[in-house]
Amino acid sequence: TVTRRQRQMCIRDRNIEELLVSPVPNWIILLGYIAGGMCRGLGVGILVTLLALYFTSFGIHSIPVTIAIVLMTSLMFSIAGLINAIFASNFDDISIIPTFVLTPLTYLGGVFYSINLLGDFWRDVSMFNPILYMVNAFRFGISGITDINIIWSFSMVGLASVVLFLFALHLLEKGSRLRS
């Protein structure tokens, strides 16, 4: 939502056009938007965690793994949010991806159950879900329990982030829906 509003303000004020015609490489512009999205996401996450710690306490099994997966997840969702903002033509379109893509992926990503409880077919289908790898890496960082090898989880989240980054860079270079 915030990214979408920023995009509309940038188009209205012609800021994005100024960026696109500037001598700054597109990948640096993209990194700026991604860093902004990550900072906002991490800020909200830290505030929610601090608020939760007021009511309860929890241990962390591996602080480096937890920090790494939180950063990688915020990176991936920042890029995905930027792509969603580029494709959304109005405020209502912003909710299409979270409603029809993100929610089912979350429910099928092992958030509420172990994927070992699934049948072979659905377990194999779940292996194509990037949220499964984020959830399992985060679960390992907090509790030390995982269904998937932690290296494999980090590799898949990293691969998904690279693919999304390259797609966002392609959209930025093409100027898709950015130049009016």
Locations of regions flagged by a protein language model:
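Short helix-to-coil transition segments within interhelical loops
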Residues: 20-25
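Transmembrane helical bundles of ABC transporters
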Residues: 14-15, 19, 30-34
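Membrane-interfacial helix-loop-helix junctions in multi-pass membrane proteins
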Residues: 106-163
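Hydrophobic transmembrane alpha-helices
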Residues: 71, 87, 97-108, 122, ...
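Hydrophobic alpha-helical interface/terminus motif in multipass membrane transporters
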Residues: 16-19, 51, 55, 84, ...
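Single conserved hydrophobic/aromatic residue that forms the stacking wall/gate
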Residues: 1-11
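Alpha-helical transmembrane segments and their short interhelical loops
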Residues: 26-98, 146-169
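Short cytosolic juxtamembrane segments of multi-pass membrane proteins
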Residues: 172-180
